[in-house]
């Protein structure tokens, strides 16, 4: 053994003695090299994310204009975690959570942990306590813009508080990022959009809360309404584009197009039909959609209704779509230990 190797081994032993086993290791010694994920609740978004869902132990930012579907997207993720037997928490800083709508999206409101904090510090401390417990699989903070620092709440209207929220978020994320990774919790931060004053060239839009969240996020999703969906003269929903603007675990800039129906959330039938048509799993001839010579319906809406009534057929088509994109069934919710070394 060379002197360099002996010196390195001694240093590694000293580090493990001081900071505990697993504090330093070779990358190949990690028990899990494959990224563990939980489905977003949308097949189109799972494909756009590239790994079949949201990566566990990572920070996700979902931002977009008002009423674009940000909370709907995050509630579908909560419903998916609960469906797999996991624990979910919702920090409602906006004080705008609608339990009836959440229930329609499949959220079990009897099991969902809800906090409506008075200040930004309180909301982030509650989030930290839940993450450090290691018992929460997903936590949603709605929204970053509503995490108002205590000094601003206790001050007078018109008082200037420059950079307070950015400093609060920066400090919170420094503390949270390590705990989120160890506990394998998915932390979703919903954010709003603001416009910079005086921008002549480039995009004037920005997100509040400083730059820290942009850096700490593994995935950033931009949610925007594309067009209205109508049945006759009635507007029944929106076609929504979810763009993956940052992705550390797969190629970014993929776009998922989903139908968000009022009172129902993301239409599973709509996204399966669109994706299967693109892959020629479902054949389209004129206005008719068919699968294995079985006609699904005339027109997109009728075909969606047929799939809604025939769930076995819908899931069979979804299986072939997942298989084509190399996305298996969700990795699910597991009991994970902090130690990542093999015994």
Swiss-Prot record:
PROSITE patterns: RECA_1 (PS00321), RECA_2 (PS50162), RECA_3 (PS50163). SMART domains: AAA. It comes from the Bacteria. It is found in: Cytoplasm. Can catalyze the hydrolysis of ATP in the presence of single-stranded DNA, the ATP-dependent uptake of single-stranded DNA by duplex DNA, and the ATP-dependent hybridization of homologous single-stranded DNAs. It interacts with LexA causing its activation and leading to its autocatalytic cleavage. NCBIfam families: tigrfam_recA (TIGR02012). HAMAP family: RecA. This is Protein RecA. It comes from Bacillus cereus (strain G9842).
């Amino acid at each position: 053994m060379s002197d360099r190797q002996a010196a390195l081994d001694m240093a590694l032993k000293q580090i493990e003695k001081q900071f505990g086993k697993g504090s330093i290791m070779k990358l190949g010694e990690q028990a899990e090299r494959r990224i563990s994920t939980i489905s977003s609740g949308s097949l189109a978004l799972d494909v756009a994310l590239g790994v079949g869902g949201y990566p566990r132990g990572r920070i996700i930012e979902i931002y977009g204009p008002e009423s674009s579907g940000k909370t709907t997207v995050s509630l579908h993720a909560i419903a998916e975690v609960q469906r797999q037997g996991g624990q979910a928490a919702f920090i409602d800083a906006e004080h705008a959570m609608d339990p009836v709508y959440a229930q329609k999206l499949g959220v079990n409101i009897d099991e969902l942990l809800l906090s409506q904090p008075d200040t930004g510090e309180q909301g982030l401390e509650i989030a930290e306590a839940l993450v450090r417990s290691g018992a929460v699989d997903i936590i949603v903070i709605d929204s970053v813009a509503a995490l108002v620092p205590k000094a601003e709440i206790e001050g007078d209207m018109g008082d200037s508080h420059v950079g307070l929220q950015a400093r609060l978020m920066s400090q919170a994320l420094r503390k949270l990022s390590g705990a989120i990774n160890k506990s394998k919790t998915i932390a979703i931060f919903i954010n709003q959009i603001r416009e910079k004053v005086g921008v002549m060239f480039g995009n004037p839009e920005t997100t509040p809360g400083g730059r820290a969240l942009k850096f700490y996020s593994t995935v950033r999703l931009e949610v925007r309404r594309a067009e209205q969906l109508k049945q006759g003269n009635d507007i029944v929903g929106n076609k929504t584009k979810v763009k993956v603007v940052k992705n550390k675990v797969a190629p970014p800039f993929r776009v998922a197009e989903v139908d968000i129906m009022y009172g129902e959330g993301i239409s599973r039938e709509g996204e399966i039909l669109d994706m299967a048509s693109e892959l020629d799993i479902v054949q389209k001839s004129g206005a008719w959609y068919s699968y294995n010579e079985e006609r699904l319906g005339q027109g997109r809406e009728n075909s969606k209704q047929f799939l809604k009534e025939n769930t076995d057929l819908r899931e069979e088509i979804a299986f072939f779509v997942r298989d084509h994109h190399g996305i298996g069934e969700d990795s699910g919710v597991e009991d994970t230990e902090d130690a990542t070394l093999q015994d």
